[in-house]
């Protein structure tokens, strides 16, 4: 289950940063799935560079937890983005969407397949200020 949650972080976060402002961001993620006793909240912080903020496919995820997941369809709007993705090694597929501004964001992702898994994530994020060492 822990690996699946890490996979969701890798999958959900790359598509969130189309025009987000660089700096220190705080994210709260709630994961739900059938059979889970209650939602599994998680939080993390990320220092996003100006380069990462410009390109949603190069932001987010954890390089120490590689994955073969890839975005297959990506649609961008002025303050929203949606995507479809697939992860060949796990047999999982998913869809997601996000709305954002320079200092905040919200997203929803649904991933299923593999061992009949149906995971849903809701993410909220806010910019805290400049990156801190």
Where are each of the predicted segments found?
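Bacterial N-terminal signal peptides
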Residues: 2-12
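Sec/Tat signal peptide C-region and signal peptidase I cleavage site
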Residues: 13-17
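A short, structured loop/turn motif at beta-sheet edges
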Residues: 18-21, 73-79, 97-104, 126-133
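Tryptophan-anchored aromatic micro-motifs
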Residues: 21-35
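Short beta-strand segments that buttress and anchor functional surface loops
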Residues: 27-29, 81-88, 107-113
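Short, cysteine-centered beta-strand-loop-beta hairpins and adjacent loop/turn segments enriched
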Residues: 32-38, 89-93, 113-117
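Central antiparallel beta-sheet cores of small beta-barrel/beta-sandwich binding domains
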Residues: 39-95
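Edge beta-strand at a domain terminus
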Residues: 113-133
């Amino acid at each position: 289950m822990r690996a699946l949650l890490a996979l969701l972080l890798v999958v959900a976060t790359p598509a969130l940063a189309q025009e987000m402002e660089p700096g220190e961001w705080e994210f709260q993620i709630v994961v739900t799935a059938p059979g889970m006793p209650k939602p599994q909240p998680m939080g993390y912080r990320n220092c996003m560079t100006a380069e990462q903020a410009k390109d949603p496919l190069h932001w987010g995820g954890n390089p120490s937890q590689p994955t073969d997941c890839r975005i297959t369809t990506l649609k961008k709007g002025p303050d929203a983005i949606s995507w479809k993705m697939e992860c060949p090694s796990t047999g999982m597929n998913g869809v997601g969407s996000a709305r954002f501004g320079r200092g905040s964001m919200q997203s929803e992702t649904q991933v299923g397949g593999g061992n009949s898994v149906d995971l849903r994530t809701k993410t909220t994020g806010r910019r805290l200020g400049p990156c801190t060492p």
